[in-house]
A protein has these predicted regions:
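Catalytic-domain carbohydrate-binding cleft regions of carbohydrate-active enzymes
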Residues: 1-206
Length: 206
Protein backbone atom coordinates (compact mmCIF):
# COMPACT_ATOMS: atom_id res chain seq x y z
CA UNK A 1 0.00 0.00 0.00
CA UNK A 2 1.66 3.18 -1.21
CA UNK A 3 -1.12 5.42 0.06
CA UNK A 4 -2.59 6.05 -3.38
CA UNK A 5 -6.31 6.64 -3.03
CA UNK A 6 -7.16 7.92 -6.48
CA UNK A 7 -6.16 8.54 -10.07
CA UNK A 8 -6.63 11.35 -12.53
CA UNK A 9 -6.39 9.67 -15.94
CA UNK A 10 -5.31 12.28 -18.48
CA UNK A 11 -4.38 11.99 -22.16
CA UNK A 12 -6.03 8.58 -22.37
CA UNK A 13 -7.10 8.59 -26.01
CA UNK A 14 -5.33 8.81 -29.39
CA UNK A 15 -5.00 12.47 -30.34
CA UNK A 16 -2.04 13.01 -32.68
CA UNK A 17 -2.36 11.36 -36.06
CA UNK A 18 -0.07 13.45 -38.29
CA UNK A 19 -1.92 12.50 -41.44
CA UNK A 20 -0.01 13.16 -44.70
CA UNK A 21 -2.59 15.71 -45.85
CA UNK A 22 -2.38 17.80 -42.68
CA UNK A 23 1.40 17.57 -42.49
CA UNK A 24 1.62 18.75 -46.10
CA UNK A 25 -0.64 21.71 -45.37
CA UNK A 26 1.39 22.64 -42.29
CA UNK A 27 4.76 22.54 -44.08
CA UNK A 28 3.38 24.54 -47.01
CA UNK A 29 2.08 27.16 -44.60
CA UNK A 30 5.38 27.30 -42.71
CA UNK A 31 7.38 27.55 -45.95
CA UNK A 32 5.21 30.41 -47.19
CA UNK A 33 5.69 32.30 -43.93
CA UNK A 34 9.46 31.78 -44.04
CA UNK A 35 9.56 33.76 -47.30
CA UNK A 36 7.84 36.80 -45.78
CA UNK A 37 9.89 39.69 -44.43
CA UNK A 38 7.32 40.81 -41.88
CA UNK A 39 4.96 38.50 -40.04
CA UNK A 40 1.79 39.82 -38.46
CA UNK A 41 -0.65 38.47 -35.91
CA UNK A 42 -2.77 36.74 -38.54
CA UNK A 43 0.30 34.90 -39.82
CA UNK A 44 1.14 33.70 -36.32
CA UNK A 45 -2.34 32.45 -35.48
CA UNK A 46 -2.67 30.90 -38.92
CA UNK A 47 0.43 28.83 -38.20
CA UNK A 48 -0.92 27.92 -34.76
CA UNK A 49 -4.17 26.73 -36.35
CA UNK A 50 -2.28 24.56 -38.82
CA UNK A 51 -0.36 22.97 -35.92
CA UNK A 52 -3.55 22.40 -33.94
CA UNK A 53 -5.20 20.80 -36.96
CA UNK A 54 -2.76 17.91 -36.59
CA UNK A 55 -4.67 16.65 -33.57
CA UNK A 56 -8.21 15.54 -32.82
CA UNK A 57 -9.51 15.94 -36.36
CA UNK A 58 -12.69 13.89 -36.94
CA UNK A 59 -11.59 13.29 -40.53
CA UNK A 60 -8.49 11.52 -39.21
CA UNK A 61 -10.60 9.33 -36.93
CA UNK A 62 -12.40 8.06 -40.03
CA UNK A 63 -9.30 7.65 -42.17
CA UNK A 64 -7.67 4.55 -40.71
CA UNK A 65 -8.63 1.10 -39.50
CA UNK A 66 -7.67 -1.44 -36.85
CA UNK A 67 -7.09 -5.06 -37.78
CA UNK A 68 -8.82 -7.24 -35.18
CA UNK A 69 -9.70 -10.90 -34.84
CA UNK A 70 -13.25 -9.97 -35.86
CA UNK A 71 -12.11 -8.03 -38.91
CA UNK A 72 -11.23 -4.44 -39.76
CA UNK A 73 -12.74 -1.70 -37.61
CA UNK A 74 -12.66 2.00 -38.44
CA UNK A 75 -11.03 4.02 -35.68
CA UNK A 76 -13.90 6.44 -35.04
CA UNK A 77 -16.08 3.46 -34.06
CA UNK A 78 -13.74 2.54 -31.18
CA UNK A 79 -12.02 5.83 -30.30
CA UNK A 80 -13.72 6.27 -26.92
CA UNK A 81 -13.02 2.68 -25.92
CA UNK A 82 -9.47 3.73 -25.03
CA UNK A 83 -10.63 6.02 -22.25
CA UNK A 84 -13.49 3.76 -21.25
CA UNK A 85 -11.26 0.70 -20.86
CA UNK A 86 -8.66 2.69 -18.94
CA UNK A 87 -11.35 3.94 -16.56
CA UNK A 88 -12.61 0.40 -16.04
CA UNK A 89 -9.11 -1.00 -15.50
CA UNK A 90 -8.28 1.64 -12.89
CA UNK A 91 -11.66 1.29 -11.18
CA UNK A 92 -11.44 -2.50 -10.96
CA UNK A 93 -7.87 -2.26 -9.69
CA UNK A 94 -9.02 -0.03 -6.85
CA UNK A 95 -11.85 -2.46 -6.04
CA UNK A 96 -9.28 -5.26 -5.81
CA UNK A 97 -6.58 -3.39 -3.90
CA UNK A 98 -8.86 -1.32 -1.65
CA UNK A 99 -12.05 -3.35 -1.26
CA UNK A 100 -14.90 -1.56 0.46
CA UNK A 101 -13.11 1.80 0.42
CA UNK A 102 -14.06 4.91 -1.52
CA UNK A 103 -11.64 6.06 -4.20
CA UNK A 104 -11.21 9.15 -6.32
CA UNK A 105 -11.08 8.45 -10.05
CA UNK A 106 -11.85 10.72 -12.96
CA UNK A 107 -10.77 10.70 -16.57
CA UNK A 108 -10.51 12.90 -19.60
CA UNK A 109 -11.83 10.40 -22.11
CA UNK A 110 -14.42 7.76 -21.38
CA UNK A 111 -17.53 6.05 -22.70
CA UNK A 112 -21.13 5.62 -21.61
CA UNK A 113 -21.28 3.06 -18.80
CA UNK A 114 -17.84 3.86 -17.38
CA UNK A 115 -19.41 6.10 -14.75
CA UNK A 116 -19.70 3.00 -12.55
CA UNK A 117 -15.92 3.24 -12.03
CA UNK A 118 -15.16 6.95 -12.18
CA UNK A 119 -16.12 10.46 -13.17
CA UNK A 120 -15.11 12.71 -16.03
CA UNK A 121 -13.94 16.23 -16.57
CA UNK A 122 -14.41 18.18 -19.74
CA UNK A 123 -10.76 18.43 -20.80
CA UNK A 124 -8.51 21.38 -21.61
CA UNK A 125 -10.41 24.60 -22.18
CA UNK A 126 -9.51 28.27 -22.61
CA UNK A 127 -10.00 31.33 -20.44
CA UNK A 128 -12.78 32.89 -22.47
CA UNK A 129 -16.47 33.65 -22.20
CA UNK A 130 -17.24 31.33 -25.12
CA UNK A 131 -15.48 28.42 -23.40
CA UNK A 132 -17.34 29.11 -20.16
CA UNK A 133 -20.61 28.95 -22.09
CA UNK A 134 -19.52 25.75 -23.85
CA UNK A 135 -18.70 24.08 -20.52
CA UNK A 136 -22.04 25.15 -19.04
CA UNK A 137 -23.74 23.52 -22.04
CA UNK A 138 -21.59 20.38 -21.90
CA UNK A 139 -22.11 19.65 -18.21
CA UNK A 140 -25.77 18.54 -18.44
CA UNK A 141 -24.87 16.40 -21.46
CA UNK A 142 -22.23 14.33 -19.65
CA UNK A 143 -24.47 14.05 -16.59
CA UNK A 144 -27.34 12.74 -18.72
CA UNK A 145 -24.86 10.11 -19.95
CA UNK A 146 -24.50 8.95 -16.34
CA UNK A 147 -21.39 10.89 -15.32
CA UNK A 148 -22.78 12.68 -12.28
CA UNK A 149 -19.26 13.18 -10.89
CA UNK A 150 -18.09 15.68 -13.48
CA UNK A 151 -16.55 19.12 -13.78
CA UNK A 152 -14.43 21.52 -15.81
CA UNK A 153 -11.14 23.40 -15.49
CA UNK A 154 -12.43 26.47 -13.66
CA UNK A 155 -11.04 29.79 -14.95
CA UNK A 156 -9.82 28.03 -18.10
CA UNK A 157 -6.79 25.81 -18.63
CA UNK A 158 -4.94 28.00 -21.13
CA UNK A 159 -4.57 31.75 -21.65
CA UNK A 160 -5.03 34.39 -18.95
CA UNK A 161 -8.34 34.77 -17.19
CA UNK A 162 -9.66 38.07 -15.80
CA UNK A 163 -11.13 38.79 -12.35
CA UNK A 164 -14.68 39.02 -13.71
CA UNK A 165 -14.30 35.87 -15.79
CA UNK A 166 -12.84 34.01 -12.80
CA UNK A 167 -15.83 35.08 -10.73
CA UNK A 168 -18.25 33.68 -13.33
CA UNK A 169 -16.26 30.45 -13.59
CA UNK A 170 -16.60 30.06 -9.83
CA UNK A 171 -20.36 30.63 -10.01
CA UNK A 172 -20.54 27.80 -12.52
CA UNK A 173 -18.17 25.59 -10.54
CA UNK A 174 -20.29 25.78 -7.40
CA UNK A 175 -22.88 23.65 -9.20
CA UNK A 176 -20.44 20.95 -10.38
CA UNK A 177 -19.55 17.92 -8.22
CA UNK A 178 -15.92 18.01 -9.43
CA UNK A 179 -14.95 21.60 -8.63
CA UNK A 180 -11.33 22.37 -9.43
CA UNK A 181 -9.29 25.33 -10.62
CA UNK A 182 -6.68 24.19 -13.12
CA UNK A 183 -4.31 25.90 -15.56
CA UNK A 184 -1.20 25.27 -17.62
CA UNK A 185 2.26 26.58 -16.72
CA UNK A 186 2.10 29.44 -19.23
CA UNK A 187 -1.11 30.98 -17.86
CA UNK A 188 -1.28 33.54 -15.08
CA UNK A 189 -1.61 32.29 -11.53
CA UNK A 190 -5.36 32.03 -11.08
CA UNK A 191 -6.09 30.85 -7.56
CA UNK A 192 -9.25 32.66 -6.52
CA UNK A 193 -7.58 34.52 -3.66
CA UNK A 194 -5.37 36.34 -6.18
CA UNK A 195 -8.30 38.31 -7.61
CA UNK A 196 -8.46 40.98 -4.94
CA UNK A 197 -10.89 43.16 -6.91
CA UNK A 198 -13.63 40.56 -6.63
CA UNK A 199 -12.44 38.76 -3.49
CA UNK A 200 -15.43 39.85 -1.35
CA UNK A 201 -17.82 38.36 -3.93
CA UNK A 202 -15.74 35.18 -4.12
CA UNK A 203 -15.73 34.86 -0.34
CA UNK A 204 -19.50 35.36 -0.17
CA UNK A 205 -20.11 32.67 -2.79
CA UNK A 206 -17.86 30.15 -1.09
Amino acid sequence: DLGIEGFWNDMNEPALFYSPERLKAFFENAAALSRKDNLDQNDFFGLVRSVMSLMNAPEDYRSFYHDTAAGRVRHDRVHNLYGGCMTRAAGEAFQTLRPGQRTLLYCRSSIIGAHRWGGIWLGDNHSSWSQLLANIQMMPAVQMCGFLYSGADLCGFSEDTTPDLALRWLEFGLFTPLMRNHADAESREQEFYRFTDVLPAIRNML
